[in-house]
Structures are given as C-alpha cells and as structure tokens.
Amino acid sequence: MHVLMLSWEFPPVVVGGIARHVQDLSLALTRQGLEVTVLTAGPGEAPPVEKLGGLTIHRVRSENPRPLDLVGEVMQLNLNMLQRALGLAAGGRRFTLVHAHDWVTAYAAKALKHGLDLPLFATVHATEWGRNNGLHNDLQRYISDVEWWLCYEAWRVICCSHYMREELRRVFQVPEDKLRLIPNGVYPEDFA
C-alpha cells in the first residue's frame, strides 16, 4: 500500500500541531510496512526531496508569481502539489490512496481522487467555524465551504477527538458512518 499524504505543514514548516501529527503518522505507517509519500510546502532551506526509511517527503516551492492573498497562496500550493503528484504518477509511482490534511490541500486532493481514480481520506484537525466561534466574514465562509466540500468528497473523514467528531456532524452534517475517530498519540518515553 502506498499512501499519498497532502499537508501544508511538515517540518521544518511548523505553524501548529498538523506538522507533528503528519510527521508522526507518516513514520508510524512506514513502521507498519506501508510506503508513504508526503507532499508539502517547502521553504528554500529545506531539501526538495527527503527520504526517511519508507517515507519520502516532497516539498513543493512556489514557481509562480507571489500570490496576492491567502486564497491565491492556497490555490498555488494546490496546483504545485498536483503538478508534483501527477509527475510522480507519470513516472511510474502507483499510489493506493490520497490522505488530505485540512482544507488547505482540498483542491489537489479532489483532483487526485478523480484524476487518478483513488480513494480519498481527509483528516480535519479543526474547522473555521470552531476556530472563530462561528463564521463572521466572506473569507471564513469560503474556508468553511471548502472544509464541507473536502468532507463531502472524502470516502472517510478522520478526526482526532470526540469534540471534533460532534462538530463535524453538527456543522457539516457528516454522516456517522463516514467519520473515524483516531486520537493523536504520544510517546510515553517523552514523559518519563
């Protein structure tokens, strides 16, 4: 099995908890015998391709003019991720499924689901509604719409807490049989 994971955060790009989650999940999957390719945003100082055992990280860089706003930046990242994934597929890489993390990767995830005929799994770490205690402007409504759309397109929607599962059911009406609760893990030795 070969998982194509999409995340805008992956070390050294660490903004919140998604980077650590995706890194630890990817490494855990490789220890289980799966092959994992992560597509992520890449700063100039990070290697464009990095291998860690069965994990391969592809960091895509912006090759287009600098975007004017957040939505333009997200679209550009998705186009660059899509271009890299299609290049890997054209070069013989055979992926088994796409796993998208949060709304930022939704466009590339949907295109790969349909373009390569792959199952799509999505982990929703937080919602725009939850981050802002409601939706108060057009950008927040847009992001929430993309989050709903990602949940709709996904074969399975993964969340990390009971709270988030209930929020996804309430805000996006995600059916219970589509939701999977997989709590974040810890390394007990870090607390010894």
Mark where each language-model region is:
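N-terminal subdomain of nucleotide-sugar transferases
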Residues: 1-56
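Carbohydrate-associated surface elements
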Residues: 42, 163, 185
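A short, charged, and often flexible helix/loop element on the N-terminal side
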Residues: 55-89
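A short beta-strand/loop micro-motif in the catalytic core of glycosyltransferases
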Residues: 98-99, 153-162, 182
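Short His-centered aromatic/hydrophobic patch
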Residues: 100-105, 124
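Alpha-helix capping/helix-boundary segments
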Residues: 104-105, 163-165
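Nucleotide-sugar donor phosphate/pyrophosphate-binding loop at the beta->alpha transition
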Residues: 118-121, 129-149
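Acidic anion/phosphate-binding donor-loop and adjacent secondary structure
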Residues: 169, 177, 186-192
